[in-house]
Each structure stands twice: as C-alpha cells, then as structure tokens.
From Swiss-Prot:
This is Histidine--tRNA ligase. Homodimer. It catalyses: tRNA(His) + L-histidine + ATP = L-histidyl-tRNA(His) + AMP + diphosphate + H(+). It is found in: Cytoplasm. PROSITE patterns: AA_TRNA_LIGASE_II. The gene is hisS. SUPFAM superfamilies: Class II aaRS ABD-related (SSF52954), Class II aaRS and biotin synthetases (SSF55681). GO terms for molecular function: ATP binding; histidine-tRNA ligase activity.
Length: 420
C-alpha cells in the first residue's frame, strides 16, 4: 500500500528547502540584532490554554483547532498559534523576575483544520516574536519597523502597513454596547456565523470577510471614537513613533484581528503580490494575557509572519543557490580507499562540503556522479598519487586540472569556494 500526504499538509525538500532556510536564517539575524532570544515550546498543549487566550467564540477555536483526548483523558490541542504557549512559558519559568524587556522569537509549525487553498495549509509555519514588560508605544512601532526591515531585505515590495487601536478593558465595554445596538438592527443581514458572533462577542463581526456582511458594516461606529484618554494618547504616540521612523501607514478602524487577547495596538501588513490571501504578517498588544494566565500584570506585544506566504512571494523574487557538495573525492582501486576516507574527512573538518563514492565504481562513473551532484572540483586519488604524496584536482566548470599536496589543495579549494 502506498501512503500519501494528508490533505492540507506538505513536504518541503530540494530547492525549496534552501529558500526556507534562507528566510529563517535572515529572520534569526535581524531578530537577534534586536536582542530577541529563541524559544521552543511544545506543539501539543493543554486545550484550555487556547480556549482562554484566543476566545471560545472565535473561528479558530470553534472550527479549526485540532483537539483530542490523550491516553489519560486530558483534553489537549495542537497549537494553532504561538503567543499563548510563549506566555505560558513566560509565567511557568518566572521570566517576569528578570529585568524587562524579555524578548523571545520562535520559528515553527502551527495547526488549523481549515479549507486548504493557495498559500494556506493545515500545518503551516510562523515566525513569531513576543516582547514582555514594555507598555510604551515605542516597542509597538519597533515591531513594525523590524517587520519592514525584514520584508524589504527579502525584496518584498508593494506593502501596506495598517494600524488600529482596540482600546482597553476600561473603554472597550462602552464600545461593545454601542456596536451591539448598531448590529441589532442589521442582524438579519448578517451571515450565520456573524449572527452567532453578535450574541457572544459583537467585535468578532467586524472581522468577517463575507461580502454581504462587509456591506452591512459600512457605517459601523468606529472604536477609535470611544477610546479612553490613555488609549487615545497611546495610539497617537504610536503614530508619532511611526512618523519618526519614516514608515508609511494607514489607520484602519476595521482591523480587530481574529484573536480575543489583543488590547490597544493591532496591525496588519499586506501586499498586492498575494491575491485574496494578502496578509503577510500581523500582530499587536496583549496587555491582559499574562494576568489572565495567572501571572503578574505585564504589558506585552508581538507579531507573527506566515512563512508559506513569504515562500509564495519569494519563490519568484529570490534566487537562492542550492547547497551542493563543492568537492567530490574520486579514487581508483580498493587499495586507496583508506586514503580517500582521510581526504574526505580532512576537507569536511575544514568546512568544505564534500561527497565521495561509498561503493566501488569506475573512475568514469565517479566523474559522471560528481557532475550529477553538481560538484565544482573533483579530487582524484590513485596509487601513483599516494606514492608522490600529491592529488590530482579537476575543475568541473572550466576543465582545468593539476596536482597539489593536501594542504596546497585545501588552500586552492578555499580560494575557489570563497568566490562562489
């Protein structure tokens, strides 16, 4: 019986994996320059963690989360996003006792049982960052600036940065009342999901992508008009910070994000290079989440980038050279196999990607194999070469060749390798 991938999953290999590695390495370099430290949390968590943080009436929890019972009857879930796990780790390991800010980043798979389509998978990958202990809008602006820096380094253009404020637990209840009254007159025009959201959490209605709902919500009261003085000043301060950083942005009062834990700042980065699924990254502030999970009151902010979306864009705009063995060691006869192994290990120990024949092949077959794997230089070892303590080298690109000792060979290869 042949087995194949489950729907919504993917294998990543060959040329594509080099692009993934390039993007991940690029992200690590930028994030670590901003003093973000990598954190790795489990894929499986207590399901209650996500029910409390994301919100029970969100699409993620109601329709998309992979939830099951383990062998002890505990309700567990495959993580649908990364923030809740990092907050749990922040509290469990007492990071709040360390001087703020505490900055973390993660790169890894998330899981949502949704309809697979272009750029959207059931196992997908995110680059995420979380910063704890800073209430200033400076960090919000810095997160957006980091995103801009990262995306532009990947040659991703046509980007739009949109921001909004969702207020706080002091000013949001008043807006909910006003929004509820507004929606009550339009509830029959809403989709089935939004009718349900209207009763449980009317703010969720603003996040609907159904055209008929979007049409009904054209004149919705705006949350920015109901912000308390502190939230208003925080939002104005964010805009000032972005102006000082020369970041072009738009205030979009309709951005609410699909997760319940956000407070104050929320933002999205979109591009015209992706069609309908145009969001590349999104994030915001979640000042109440640490306390909700049993930790001390802690301001926090973060964002997540969709890796599959980046790959879709960068596949056409970034040319990443595949990593191939730079040197192929060919040998003639079983009597020189020991010497060939010594040369292979010597080169690898000196950080030269090297391949060889693990089975007995003719020299012609070995040269053919070296060509197929893309080696730049072939080293040929025979009994005569061992007696003379030299090795034949051949440049597979221009056909030039010569003889050299092992140390001379290393210098020659290094010069060539560094210019590639």
């Amino acid at each position: 019986m042949k087995y194949s991938l489950l729907r919504g999953m993917q294998d990543i290999f060959s040329e594509q994996i080099y692009l993934w590695q390039h993007i991940e390495e690029h992200a690590r370099k930028i994030l670590e320059n901003y003093n973000f430290q990598e954190i790795r949390t489990p894929i499986v968590e207590n399901a209650e963690l996500f029910l409390r943080s994301i919100g029970e009436d969100t699409d993620i929890v109601e329709k998309e989360m992979y939830v099951f019972q383990d062998k002890k009857g505990r309700k567990v879930a495959l993580r649908p996003e990364g923030t809740a796990s990092v907050v749990r780790a922040y509290i469990q390991h007492n990071f709040f006792n360390n001087p703020p800010p505490q900055k973390f980043y993660y790169i890894g798979p998330m899981f949502r049982y949704e309809r697979p389509q272009k750029g959207r998978f059931r196992q997908f990958h995110q680059i995420g960052v979380e910063c704890f202990g800073v209430s200033s809008s400076w960090i919000d602006a810095e997160l957006i600036y980091m995103l801009k820096l990262f995306l532009e380094k990947l040659n991703i253009n046509n980007l739009t940065y949109e921001i909004n404020s969702l207020g706080c637990k002091r000013c949001r209840p008043q807006y909910r009342k006003v929004l509820f009254s507004f929606l009550a007159d339009k509830v029959n025009q809403l989709c089935i999901d939004c009718k349900r959201r209207f009763e449980k959490n009317p703010l969720r209605v603003l996040d609907c992508k159904v055209p008929s709902c979007k049409e009904s919500l054209k004149n919705t009261p705006l949350i920015v008009d109901f912000l308390c003085q502190d939230c208003k000043e925080h939002f104005l301060s964010l805009q000032k910070e972005l102006d000082e950083m020369n970041i072009s942005y738009a205030v979009n009062p309709k951005i609410v994000r699909g997760l319940d834990y956000y407070t104050r700042t929320v933002f999205e980065v979109t591009t015209t290079m992706l069609g309908a699924q145009n969001a590349v990254a999104a994030g915001g502030r979640y000042d109440d989440l640490v306390e909700l999970f049993g930790g001390p009151t802690t301001p926090a902010a973060g964002f997540a980038i969709g890796m599959e979306r980046l790959i879709e864009i960068c596949s056409n705009s970034l040319l990443i050279k595949p990593k191939k063995p730079f040197v192929y060691v060919a040998y003639i006869g079983s009597s020189v196999e020991k010497e060939a192994k010594k040369v292979v290990n010597f080169l690898r120990n000196n950080n030269i990607p090297t391949e060889t024949a693990y089975e007995k092949l003719s020299l012609k077959s070995q040269l053919r194999k070296a060509d197929r794997v893309g080696a730049n230089i072939v080293i040929i070892i025979g009994e005569d070469e061992i007696k003379k303590s030299v090795y034949i080298w051949k440049n597979m690109k221009d056909g030039s060749q010569g003889e050299a000792s092992l140390n001379e060979l290393l210098e020659l290869i290094r010069r060539k390798y560094d210019t590639e």
